[in-house]
């Protein structure tokens, strides 16, 4: 399993590479699941993982169940705008602020050097309806025009501090076992 990408753009480039396009990228892969945890169908990077960059959408990576018939609740047919409720890209984790975060010590060690990590502990200043939470450490504008991909114009709203997530910090990710691990 590769490491996770730091940015949505890195994830997008990794997915292009999996399609045989784009330059080789050593920045990790947004595909961290091999099978849907709900139904067990295989997940393929070129087919079931999609990236929307800032310039063309919501700055999100979507992982869908690989069920070609669309019977799974997390397939592209049944959950076209969401997919599985997971985030695997650092930049998206800071903006979407999951309730449970599983990370290696290597990622946790970034805390003193990456100002965006303060968001993991609830230190936010606003929320963009399209891109998620904001902080002074993020390069982002307060508003975004309607996109050519169908997203409406949005303006950020002020938001106070949030409750921080529960953390599981593991030195070696492969040592995690049980329902969330191998």
Task: Give the role of each language-model region.
Residues 1-182:
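N-terminal helicase ATP-binding lobe
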């Amino acid at each position: 399993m590769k490491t996770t990408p730091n940015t949505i753009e890195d994830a997008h480039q990794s997915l292009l590479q999996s399609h045989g396009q784009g330059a080789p990228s050593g920045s990790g892969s947004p595909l961290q699941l091999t099978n849907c945890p709900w139904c067990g169908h295989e997940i393929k990077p070129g087919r079931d993982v999609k990236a929307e960059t800032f310039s063309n959408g919501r700055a999100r990576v979507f992982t869908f169940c690989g069920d070609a018939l669309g019977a799974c609740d997390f397939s592209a047919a049944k959950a076209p705008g969401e997919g599985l409720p997971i985030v695997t890209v650092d930049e998206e984790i800071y903006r979407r602020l999951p309730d449970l975060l599983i990370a290696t010590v290597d990622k946790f060690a970034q805390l003193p050097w990456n100002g965006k990590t303060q968001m993991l502990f609830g230190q936010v200043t606003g929320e963009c309806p399209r891109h998620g939470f904001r902080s002074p450490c993020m390069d982002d504008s307060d508003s975004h025009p309607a996109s050519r991909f169908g997203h409406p114009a949005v303006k950020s709203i002020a938001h106070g501090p949030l409750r921080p997530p529960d953390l599981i910090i593991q030195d070696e990710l492969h040592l995690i076992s049980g329902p969330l691990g191998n």
